[in-house]
Amino acid sequence: MRSVREAWLAVEHGADAIGLVSAMPSGPGPIPDDRIAAIARAVPPGVATFLLTCRTDPGDLVEQVRTAGVDTVQLVDRVPRLAYVLLASLLPAVRRVQVVHVNGEEAVADAVVAAAAGVHAVLLDSGDPTLPVKRLGGTGRTHDWDLSRRIREEIPVPLWLAGGLHAGNVGDAIARVRPFGVDVCTGVRTRGRLDREKLARFVAGVRAASS
C-alpha cells in the first residue's frame, strides 16, 4: 500500500494484512520509510502491517523495522542467520517472514533452511535475485504452483503465496497450493493505482476458494 487511503480501502474489503514496500533495486510500489511508519500507525488493530525490505545487514534491518513501527518484517532477499537472531532478540514482538523466490528445485531447500532458522512464515514469490539488478517482487509473474505445494508440505511454518495472482487465477492457486494466505500487488492495480473493482473481485475469489 502506498497511502493511508489505499490501506483503508484494502481493510474495508477484508484484507488481514497490509504490505508496505521500502526501497528496492527494482519493481513497483516502494515508498519512503517515514510514509511507511505513518501508514502503519493508521492501520486499525487486528490488521497486520508487513514491512517489505531488501536490506540484509542485521543492524540495518533492526533499525529499519524499529523505525517503521510494523508488526511483521518480510525479508525479500536472503539474509545471514545473525539477522534472524538479532530480530528475534531485539524485536521479539515482530514476526519474521522470509521470502523464497521459486525458480526451480532449489527453492525447496531455501524454504526448509528459512523455516529452520526460526521464521514465523515463508512467502513464495516469483522474483529473481540472481539478476544483475535483482528482482525481488512485483513481477506480475506466476511460478510453479506444484512446486509451491511441495514446499508447503515440507515446512513446519505457515506458507504465504504470491506472484502474479489476480481475480482470475487466485481460486486455482488456493486449490492447488492450499497456502495459509495469499499476497497480491499488481493484480489489484490499474496504471499503478489500487483498483477498487479489481480488489473486490480478488477478495471474492479468495473467499470463494476458501469456503
Regions found by a protein language model. Give the residues of each.
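Conserved N-terminal beta1-alpha1 strand-loop-helix module at the mouth
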Residues: 1-181, 186-211
